[in-house]
């Protein structure tokens, strides 16, 4: 029987957490559908990526510059990608597109969903890298 597994934000907040999740998924071949959350808090004072994205939405909606906020969010993802040693993987184009869409036509649902979308891309690349080792 095929299984759906969902991992919350704290389970996917860092590269180390991703590695634990990868091991959990790999340990059972029936775990074929993976539903990732956006990165959560890495430590108590940290901010969840979804909260960061919702703040970006508010900033964009007000017509203000979102460049620095988007850089901070991208840095979170880049830290995970580097920690997972995904050498040929990048979210640069995704961040360009997300930034453009939020500047041109800010939509709260779109902003809130990008964290899961991006973490899903990282998870897929990471799981594929485990197969190719």
Where are these regions (language model features)?
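Nucleotide/pyrophosphate-binding catalytic subdomain
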Residues: 1-131
């Amino acid at each position: 029987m095929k299984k759906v597994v969902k991992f919350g934000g704290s389970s996917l907040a860092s590269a180390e957490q991703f590695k634990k999740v990868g091991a959990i998924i790999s340990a059972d071949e029936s775990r074929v559908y993976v539903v990732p959350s956006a990165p959560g808090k890495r430590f108590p004072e940290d901010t969840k990526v979804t909260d960061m994205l919702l703040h970006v939405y508010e900033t964009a909606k007000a017509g203000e510059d979102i460049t620095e906020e988007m850089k901070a969010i991208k840095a979170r993802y880049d830290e995970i990608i580097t920690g997972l040693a995904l050498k040929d993987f990048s979210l640069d184009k995704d961040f360009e597109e997300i930034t453009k869409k939020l500047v041109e036509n800010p939509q709260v649902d779109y902003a809130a969903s990008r964290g899961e979308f991006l973490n899903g891309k990282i998870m897929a690349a990471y799981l594929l890298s485990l197969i190719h080792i």
